[in-house]
Amino acid sequence: IEKQDHWNDHFAAAMKKAYEAHPRDIEIATIYAEAILNQTPWKMWDIWKNKVAEGAGTVKAQRVLERFVDTPEGRVHPGILHLYVHLMEMSPTPEKALMAGDRLRELVPHAGHLIHMPTHIDSQCGEYRDALHWNQKGIAADLKIAERQGRMNFYTAYRVHNYHFAIYGAMFLGQYEPAISAAEEMIREIPVELLKLESPPMADFLESYISMKTHVQIR
């Protein structure tokens, strides 16, 4: 990722010019906001000090997204809603993205990742029932992709993440059965052959998930 930093910075600078030239274009705004987030991925906020992380373009991205997120066009735009959830999930105020998440979760019904994504906010706000329910929905949607394209691909990492969140939500609800069921299904969805792939190094991404069944049994 570090090797791509200069490319990310150059792209964000180019998108800034495009956005300034076309400030009302929601597609340009979406790509510009994403470009800002990609400059410091998962480092938009200092979670220990409850403030914007030093050197991050958090405020810029927030201004762009909040300009559109509650407009008629923005309320039905998967890109704007998705990025706003990503931006706010580690913020001191994740609840600000609850409405965006609610709009996103049924907007693209065959995209399991977008069904899942609002549960990042649900989990931060204690909405564990929604976290379990909507990840089960995301799992079902993504199984159609697995049946069509197989499991020997990087998207399996996204699908496994749905099981991960279903387990998390179920454990916080004190519900053993859905938690252990999700853990066992998740293991079945990770072929040994996939873990053996070296490029990309899929074991680095996926192997730790297999231990979650033990986590459920202990908790």
Residue ranges of model-derived segments:
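Short coil/linker segments at helix-helix boundaries
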Residues: 1-24, 31-75, 81-91, 100-103, ...
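Structural helix-adjacent loops and short alpha-helical linkers that scaffold large soluble proteins
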Residues: 4, 73-74, 93-95, 127-130, ...
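Alpha-helical positions within canonical tetratricopeptide repeat
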Residues: 10, 27, 60, 96-99, ...
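Alpha-helix capping and inter-helical loop/turn segments
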Residues: 41, 92-95, 218-219
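Hydrophobic/aromatic side-chain positions at a characteristic register within alpha-helices
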Residues: 89, 123, 171, 215-218
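Flexible glycine/proline-rich, aromatic-decorated loop/lid segments
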Residues: 129-146
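Extended catalytic-interface subdomain
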Residues: 135-138, 156-190, 207-210, 214
